[in-house]
Each structure stands twice: as C-alpha cells, then as structure tokens.
Amino acid sequence: YILTGKTGTKSVLSEFKINSVKKYKIESSYKPVSFEFTINRAIIFPFNKEMHSLIRYQNLLSFDVVDVYDSKYSTNIGATTDHLLKCKNKKDFLIKNIKDIYWDNFDTLILGHLDELSNLTGRTNLKKDLIQQAIAKGKNIYAFDEIPDCNGSNIFYPIINKQSLPPDRFGMLYRISKPVVGIFGTSSRQGKFTLQLKLRELLLERGYSIGQIGTEPSALLYGMDYVFPMGYNSSVYIQGFDVIRYTNYIINILCQKN
C-alpha cells in the first residue's frame, strides 16, 4: 500500500476494506440473562419434578416460598411436600388447588413446565389463562417455558439465542484460570441439577467463593450467576462453536469475579 501512496492509517484501513473478501460488523447485543424484578414472596405451580428442588433447597433461595399449587388432575392436592418428597425439608407445604389461588399472598408466580398437565387436562390455554390473571393482578412471573407473546419488566423466562452471544473473537478462546467442575449425564432423571445444587450448598457452607452456570431454567432463583437451560424443553438456540464461544466467555467472567 505504501507503493500506491496509501501511507496514513485511515487510508490503509480504507484500502483493506475495499479489497476485503468479507466484512465483519463488530457489535454485540450481549447482556446477561437475568430478571429485573425482586422476589420476596413466591408461589410455585405446578408441583412437578422441576419444582421439587425449590422445596428441597429452600435454604439457597433469597426469598420465601409461601404456597405450593397444583391441578386436581395431578392427585397431589391435599398432600404435603414432605410426604411426596419423602424427606423433611425446611418448610412443609400443603399442596393447594390452583383454582383456589390466593392472589394477595405473594408477589411472584414461579411457573413450571405445563405441557404435560395441559395434555392431561385438555386445557391447552391453561398457561395463557394463568399468565393473563397474573399480569392483571400485577404479579411478577418467572416462567420455565417461553412466553414470547408476553413482554414486560415483570415477566421473565430464560432463553439463549444469537442475541445472547458476546463479541466474535474469531475462534480465539479465553484461558480459564480457575478450577472448573462439570456435571455430566447421558439421560434425564439422573440428578444432574440436584448435584449442582448440593455442591453449591456444600461449597458455600465451607466459605468458598464460587461462580456457577445452572442447566435448568430455575438456576437464577438459587443465586447462580448464569443459566443455560439445556434440559427439558430446552430454550437454548445456539449450536456448535457458538455454544463454546458463549460458555467460554461467561466462564472467563466468573474467573475474574471469583
């Protein structure tokens, strides 16, 4: 470029741009996946597998669970959480019918997966109706499944997509400077997330400063730093190297913080 008279920085860069094969726009809309509202008193519905840990590990929550609801079709109504979980927990709850929900007793609805319950009852609009009621009552909603038709600062569901990606580093990765423990399994119902919670509980009790990425949509409720909901009804929409790019980026942030 010097031979062609392009000697200034701007001129050389301009020439590079003209002769480039492909142009990359360096921008990113990355922001941590997190909810903006404060939870003080929450109810959970329904009381299915994904909700059990919220009762077992109440000590990891920064808020109070005040009621547990389910559908009459689940056969759980009238039973206690200790009885169903076959263990004694911090607080035992009598499971109530969602039709008798007491709206004045809580500020946040933690809404679990409802597809199986909807199929069982034939009520395909079950989730929609409950969300509309919660919105009308001014309640926060933390949902495990996507509710794309509903937006607002008091509605949250975890999702990882292209908009979640950090700036492109063209294949370069951060060097991980802290020990990392990974929990892996080959199928469902192996207790992978339960083990994540148990390790969190034990390490915090021993005074360790930890950073954590949870693999269930409820992860942020326990104070985990990031959520990567890759389990049942996964809402992760990135694949291949994008997954490596994303997880390497957030692990690097955790290394710097802890």
Predicted regions mapped to residue ranges:
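Flexible phosphate-sensing "switch/lid" loops adjacent to ATP/NTP-binding sites
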Residues: 1-133, 149, 163-182, 189, ...
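A short helix->loop->beta-strand "cap" motif at the edges of active sites that frequently abuts
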Residues: 134-141, 153-154
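Hydrophobic beta-strand scaffold residues
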Residues: 141-142, 210
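Rossmann-fold NAD(P)-binding glycine/threonine-rich loop
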Residues: 147-158
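Hydrophobic positions on the alpha1 helix immediately C-terminal to the Walker A/P-loop
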Residues: 195
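Active-site signature of alpha/beta-hydrolase-fold catalytic machinery across serine-
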Residues: 198
